Amino acid sequence: MPLVPKRVKHRREFRGKMRGAAKGGKYIAFGEYGLEALESHWITNRQIEAARVAMTRYMKRGGKVWIRIFPQKSYTAKGVGVRMGSGKGAPAGWVAVVKREKIMFEIGGVDEATAREALRLASTKLPIKTKFVTRSSEVGGESNEG
């Protein structure tokens, strides 16, 4: 089931700026291992769901997965072949604004090798560079550069 807000105050939002690092959500709070963003980007609800499915399938329903991001920002698109002007387009989907250093996913209840591979598979579904972090060593970690 795709992640979408139940209701929003405004259907259309400004794009906003993605300057600097994340203010919150920089530390592992629930599981033992996490996936940290090294870049700022919009992550769509479909990308989040694809990453979740990849992790749970690899872990064969073992362990627990926490999704620390939620797509609460709508983005709009005008139809194909529509001329410029005449207002903002219709809402086309939902995105989560992820800044660098944000922990996006957490895993618990599995060994480190399984968690590392599950989060690596999840990172291939995302449009940003990520880093595998553990609760004990949140300062360092291993990154997938590209």
Swiss-Prot record:
Superkingdom in the source lineage: Bacteria
UniProt signal peptide: none
Swiss-Prot/TrEMBL GO biological process terms: translation
InterPro entries in UniProt: Ribosomal_uL16, Ribosomal_uL16_bact-type, Ribosomal_uL16_CS, Ribosomal_uL16_dom, Ribosomal_uL16_sf
GO molecular function: rRNA binding; structural constituent of ribosome; tRNA binding
GO CC term, one of those recorded: cytosolic large ribosomal subunit
Keywords attached to this entry: Ribonucleoprotein, Ribosomal protein, RNA-binding, rRNA-binding, tRNA-binding
CDD domains named among the record's database cross-references: Ribosomal_L16_L10e
The protein's assembly and partners: Part of the 50S ribosomal subunit.
Family membership noted in the UniProt record: Belongs to the universal ribosomal protein uL16 family.
PANTHER family, alphabetized: 50S/60S RIBOSOMAL PROTEIN L16 (PTHR12220), LARGE RIBOSOMAL SUBUNIT PROTEIN UL16M (PTHR12220:SF13)
Protein's job: Binds 23S rRNA and is also seen to make contacts with the A and possibly P site tRNAs.
Name of protein: Large ribosomal subunit protein uL16
Gene behind the chain: rplP
